[in-house]
Design a protein with these regions (language model features):
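Small-residue-enriched alpha-helical segments and adjacent helix-cap loops
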Residues: 27-31, 51-171
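Iron-sulfur (Fe-S) cluster-binding modules
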Residues: 1-54, 66, 70, 74, ...
Length: 171
């Protein structure tokens, strides 16, 4: 499982602070929906009919116990007590209040998690087999390759505005 280092933590914290300011400006009417849309999509936030939806990255589908606890805490405090795991091994919160999203992102950062590039037309979360690294019939552990792709593509300016979303799985 990937472990954040000081660089990762600082990058995610800076992104959380930036999005918190962008959200404040949007709610104050200083940013239009057209201006806010690409900013929220870069941070995993969709506007749906009934409420916003926040998608959280789970790199290669691996969670530690303390990360799962953090997700449960977020679901209890900011949503309806549950999240939805996706086929891409992410988790979605379907009922957060827009004004709470910056706090959710800050809580995720404390658990070494984020929502960067989980929506919009970019390279999405890289997935692998849920038994990667322990399967008896595995020829090679795909997780190091997933991590190389994740580091290479995350926040890469050439992949921020693709014509469509791009999904990668390494088996």
């Amino acid at each position: 499982m990937y472990q954040y280092d000081a660089y990762d933590r600082e990058l995610v914290r800076a992104r959380v602070a930036e999005f918190g300011d962008q959200t404040r400006r949007y709610l104050a009417g200083e940013l239009s929906e057209e201006q806010f849309k690409p900013l929220r999509l870069m941070n995993g936030l969709y506007f749906q009919r009934h409420a916003p939806m926040l998608r959280v990255a789970v790199p290669y589908g691996l969670l530690s116990a303390w990360q799962l606890y953090a997700l449960a805490d977020i679901a209890e405090r900011y949503d309806r007590g549950y999240g939805h795991f996706t086929t891409r091994q992410n988790i979605q919160f379907n009922w957060p209040k827009l004004e709470s999203v910056p706090a959710i992102l800050a809580d995720l950062a404390e658990a070494d998690m984020h929502a960067i590039q989980t929506s919009g037309n970019c390279i999405r979360n890289v997935t692998s087999d849920h038994l990667a690294g322990v399967a008896a019939d595995e020829l090679a552990d795909p997780r190091p390759y997933c991590e190389l792709i994740r580091q290479w593509s995350t926040l890469h300016p050439e992949f921020a505005y693709l014509p469509r979303k791009f999904k990668i799985a390494v088996m």
